[in-house]
Amino acid sequence: MRVIVKGGVWRNTEDEILKAAISKYGKNQWARISSLLVRKTPKQCKARWYEWLDPSIKKTEDEKLLHLAKLMPTQWRTIAPIVGRTATQCLERYQKLLDDAEARDNEELGLGAGEDESSKPATDARGLRPGEIDTDPETRPARPDPIDMDDDEKEMLSEARARLANTQGKKAKRKARERQLEEARRLAFLQKKRELKAAGINLRAKPKKKGMDYNADIPFEKQPAPGFYDVTEEQAKVHAAPVGSTLRALEGKRKQELDEIEERKKRQKKGDGKSNQTQQFVAAREAQIKKLKEQEQIIRRRKLNLPIPQVGERELEDIVKIGQAGELARELVGDGNKATEGLLGEYEALGQAKMARTPRTAPQQDNVMAEARNLRNMMAAQTPLLGEENTPLHGPSVGTGFEGATPRHDVAATPNPLATSARGGVLTSTRTVPGVGTTPLRTPFRDDLNINDDASVYGETPMNDRRRLAESRRALKAGFAALPKPENNFELAETEEDEEEAEEAEPLTEEDAAERDARLKAAREEEERRELERRSTVIKKGLPRPVNVNTYKLLDDLNSAIVEQTDEEMAAAFKLVNLEVAMLMKHDSIAHPLPGTSTPGGLASEYDMPEDDFVAEAKNAIHTELANALGLPGASDEHLRLAIGAAAEENEAAFAEAWAEEREGLVYSPSTRTWVDKTSLSPEELSACYAAMINASRDRVIAEATKAAKAEKKLGKQLGGYQTLNEKAKKAIVDVMEEIHQTKRDMETFLMLKGIEEAAAPARLEKIREEVAVLEKRERDLQARYAELNDRRRENLAAIEQLEEDKIVLAAQVALEAQEGEVADGDVDMNGA
């Protein structure tokens, strides 16, 4: 008898059968799945799926595994779903990587004794010793199928193919057969019923005792709640009867018929491809395996990252044209005098490019091995309480880093020879010398005629020259400072040019970008603040001002208002003030124009803005003079503002009266757009002025009304909800107040009733007490009468009982006497006989 031990290495055939069975039966029926595999148990099938065949498992995540182990040590249950493996696989792979790192370190230090078969771990399926069995074959790759398979394997494969191809089981067939019988029974009953009806026999439907008539009633019907809309028209709508339609057309195709049609199509399609299925199976399997291998190779292949092109097509055309022009010039010179041939050097642009080669890509570090070494060193480290040196780790540039949950990847790109500096014939990919950038310059350095001296440096800039000069000066000053103390002191005055050059010299260390941006931002904000402070008070406070300013007319009006002064200096000072006011108003109309101005845009103001220091001195002088005039020397701005406000309030009434009187004599002239005196105008001009004022007032009223209507409409939209809520709240408040008033009236009524009841209660209580006393007396009399009668009743009952007893005794005596008489008579008869 052959004994089969289930288990062992998995084969490709078993993997495919397992995947097909899982797709049909799911991931819960492992016993049924394992019945398709002769040599595997349900537990092994489940382990094979979750440990190897699950598509969510990724098998090349060593770098991510080490990175997560560094971030979350010993938390394998947390790391497993992130990596896409199980916790056991993560732990085994982690230990294997540490062992590999240790073995490599031993090899580098010369401590390894060489790798042989005995040194290989037993957990590696490829390194098993003879006679050993893999303890965890579910986590290993499948073994290829042999060309000549065993009979058991062929039988298993054919049985699995037949079972998996059968989509309908025994239960499904039985259900289909029951449905067919039920349909045949129904059709036979209908045929019988029709024949009896044709013969004149009507079968009366037998009502079911329990259940529902589904032809007459609607099961689980719920009448809809009456709504707000009238549905009488819909209820009165007449539906046409299905006259001329068959029952089959009304019912449509049943689900069983649809399933049969679908099954018939599947069988037909399967029958068409069944002939060449056997030949196509092997070819399709080989093509699928080949495709998977190609995808694996593509995944392993490194991504090609080319540098950005430094020269475009148009630049290449320009370079070709420049080269052709140089060659033509050289041919022209070569055809002429030989003495001029030496004036042209060899400036071929492709001279060095012919010998140039693409630099080699910098070698990449093995991040997996570096992280494994770091983790191994950290595991072997002692406690920090001992005070020893830190654990030796690789630099921050090597490894996966600590930036996030995913490891850091350094993309390797091919170096660009055009963007790589070539000094001394050696191409370097990094910038080692400051001063010259690694990007190609616009004009290459070619000096065949030795025009530049040897001391000049290629790529120097004026900044580098100034920096070198400042460095030499500092070195010279340091040397002078190191000299011994002089016996005679001499002072040398540094010229202004040297001071300016020293100020222009830049510092040795480059300023940080963040500090520079902060300094420039602070400077801009300070300049903006000063610009805002330089504005006039009218602009700052937004006071009304004229749209257009005529400087000459305004200056004439202001100068004409100057009272004739005996002091000519005071009059000249007033004129200077008026000139400054007119120029400032003109500057405001240009720098801050109002809508409707006639000043063209982009016009620069001719006003010379005074310096900030002069303005500050003038404000201080005005402040001091105003404080002295108000009798508050040394007062602050706030105190002066309060004092001026108090003085203005005292004269407000007088000012209003004076302005009203002055206002009566002024009208607005539309021609000059100013307020003029009435007496200086003719009647026609005065009428035109009044008409213009009326029109302006009407326009202003219309504008204000339009604005008010828009505001009302806008507020109506915004406050419509609030108004509704207000109405509801008002109604609720009114209802509550009415309820309060009604409650107050009820309370007053009940208080009045309380007073009446308190007044009438004593009399009623006294009357009730008298009635109670009468009732109590009557009750006592009746109770006494009842006790007397009860005693007499008991006496009578006792007498009756005594008489009954006497009667019984008397009857007994009579009977006894009669018996004695009979006995005596008997004795006499006996004696006589």
From Swiss-Prot:
UniProt KW keywords: Coiled coil, Cytoplasm, DNA-binding, mRNA processing, mRNA splicing, Nucleus, Repeat, Spliceosome
Family: Belongs to the CEF1 family.
Main location: cytoplasm
Alphabetized InterPro entries for the sequence: CDC5L/Cef1, Cdc5p/Cef1_C, Homeodomain-like_sf, Myb_dom, SANT/Myb, SANT_CDC5L_II
Domain HTH myb-type: 2-57, 58-102
Function: Involved in pre-mRNA splicing and cell cycle control.
Source organism superkingdom: Eukaryota
Keyword Ribosomal protein among record annotations: no
Protein known as: Pre-mRNA-splicing factor CEF1
Subunit structure: Associated with the spliceosome.
Portion annotated as DNA-binding: 30-53, 76-98
GO MF entry, a single one: DNA binding
Annotated CDD domains: SANT, SANT_CDC5_II
Organism from which the protein derives: Cryptococcus neoformans var. neoformans serotype D (strain B-3501A) (Filobasidiella neoformans)
Location in the cell: Cytoplasm; Nucleus
Composition-biased stretches (Basic and acidic residues): 126-146, 250-273, 515-534
Compositionally biased residues, Acidic residues: 493-514
Xref: Pfam families: Myb_Cef (PF11831), Myb_DNA-binding (PF00249)
